[in-house]
A protein has these predicted regions:
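Helix-loop-helix hairpin linking two adjacent transmembrane segments in secondary transporters
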Residues: 161-203
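Conserved MFS/SLC helix-loop-helix module at the cytosolic interface between two early adjacent transmembrane helices
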Residues: 82-118
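Extracytoplasmic gate region of multi-pass secondary transporters
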Residues: 43-44, 229-287
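Helix-breaking motifs and short loop linkers at transmembrane-helix boundaries and internal kinks
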Residues: 95, 116-122, 150, 301, ...
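Helix-to-loop junctions at the C-terminal end of transmembrane segments
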Residues: 83-95, 289-302
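Cytosolic juxtamembrane N-terminal segment immediately preceding the first transmembrane helix
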Residues: 1-44
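C-terminal ends and interior cores of transmembrane alpha-helices
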Residues: 105-118, 312-329
Length: 429
């Protein structure tokens, strides 16, 4: 097994007492919430953005091209995420807070730069770099929370941490509804600079956790050493399934609603607003799933069985929402009714992994392991939006394409058994 070289004998694990757990939680939560806000804006203003940028790039604006290029740009953004495994290793080596600040600066500035785009290529480059920054925030922030709060609060706060994502998505939808038509899509992207101000607070108020291996210099290859490799690959496979499923299902809800209503004669601006409403409703379910996650895992007493529940729930909710409500019944009202259930399972499942994933790795590999699992997941997940756009263009139906690709949750079930059961165990040093 590969050895992890340390610069001194390890000190006992000490939880900081100079900073309240609540302050650490809210600082981490705020970073992830603004992260969600920046990443979600695109799905709410997709139609308006491509309506301007496609002609500027010599591409016709039509239903098929919006699907194809919209999916391609989603995938480019997620490839940026996929390249962000560097941040997790850096957080283990150089500190959680320092690296978290750098990731926030990268994604906030390059999200704002998207508003300066004059064509598809420039926009894609900015989205890729923004994705690179966003992908690293989780790998630094989640270990920071796990290692900085008392054990008796850790699972509860970690489960609630993912409420930041639906809150960010909710805020993005709300801002789109309130000022999207006034600011336009460029103005919406300019708002992405706001998270940069969070770094001032982080650097001044949040210390590095006093970890047992504070002086360790982890080798990235230790993730694949004997005794660790199965956990690493199982975690990566599970993240791949839920990321692919998420980006292939509920993040398309605003676009499905907007394109369906625009095809029925509604103005693009009004259809975009209704798409934002769909996002708001979906996020209500996501928020509920995250809030209940610590309770659900406690009642089931197993991280694995909780994962099985949410994988199967995700599959059923995707098929019910898209195949039954949209494809068979052609009923937008029923679709809106099912959206909270869709959000509860497909996005709420991430609340489980804010608890489970950091528990799978020792402290010196926690950032690298979390970062690798998410990055690997994003590599596969990046194919989801492109496949949705391509299959939808081929079949002439977003709902059919989305339902077909929801089988990813079935593929993921065997990997749950390969991941370690960490329920009722203290966080490993």
């Amino acid at each position: 097994m590969s050895q992890i070289v340390t610069g001194a004998d390890p000190e006992p694990f000490v939880t900081p007492t100079t900073v309240s757990p609540q302050r650490i939680f809210w600082a981490t939560w705020l970073g992830w919430m603004l992260d969600g806000f920046d990443s979600a804006m695109y799905s709410y203003i997709l139609v308006a953005t491509l309506t301007e940028l496609l002609p500027a790039s010599g591409i016709a604006v039509n239903h098929a091209n919006i699907g194809i290029y919209g999916g391609l740009l989603f995938s480019i953004f997620m490839l940026g995420w996929a390249c962000s495994m560097f941040w997790g290793w850096a957080a283990d080596r150089y500190g959680r807070v320092r690296i978290m600040c750098l990731t926030v600066l990268v994604y906030s500035f390059f999200t704002a730069f998207c508003g300066l785009s004059t064509g598809i290529v420039m926009f894609a480059i900015f989205r890729f770099i923004a994705g690179f920054g966003i992908g690293g925030e989780w790998a630094a922030g989640t270990p920071l929370l796990h290692e900085s709060v008392p054990e008796n609060m850790r699972v509860r706060l970690a489960g609630w941490l993912h409420t930041a994502t639906p809150t960010g998505l909710f805020l993005a939808a709300l801002v789109t509804l309130m000022v999207g038509s006034l600011f336009g899509w460029r103005g919406m992207f300019f708002l992405g600079i706001l998270p940069a101000f969070l770094t001032i607070y982080l650097r001044r108020n949040i210390p590095e956790p006093q970890r047992r291996s504070a002086l360790a210099k982890p080798a990235f290859s230790a993730l694949f050493a004997k005794g660790q490799a199965q956990t690493t690959w199982a975690a990566a496979a599970l993240l791949a399934c839920i990321i692919f499923g998420l980006w292939s299902s509920n993040f398309w809800a605003p676009t499905v609603v907007a394109t369906k209503l625009a095809a029925a004669g509604m103005t693009v601006a009004h259809a975009q607003q209704m798409g934002a409403v769909a996002g708001l409703i979906t996020n209500v379910g996501t928020l509920l799933g995250c809030l209940l996650m610590p309770w659900i895992t406690g009642r089931l007493g197993s991280r694995r069985w909780t994962a099985v529940l949410f994988f199967l729930g995700s599959l059923v909710s995707v098929v019910a929402s898209y195949s039954i409500a949209i494809q068979l019944a052609d009923n937008l009202i029923l679709f809106f009714v099912l959206l909270p259930v869709l959000g509860f399972f497909t996005n709420g499942v991430f609340g489980l992994f804010t608890i489970w994933l950091p528990e799978m790795f020792p402290s010196v590999l926690r950032g690298a392991g979390s970062g690798f699992a998410f990055s690997f997941g994003r590599i596969l997940g990046a194919a989801g939006p492109t496949l949705i756009g391509a299959v939808a263009a081929l079949l002439g139906s977003y709902p059919t394409a989305i339902s077909l690709l929801s089988l990813i949750y079935v593929i993921g079930l065997p990997f749950i058994a390969l991941a370690p059961e960490t329920a009722n165990r203290a966080l490993a040093d």
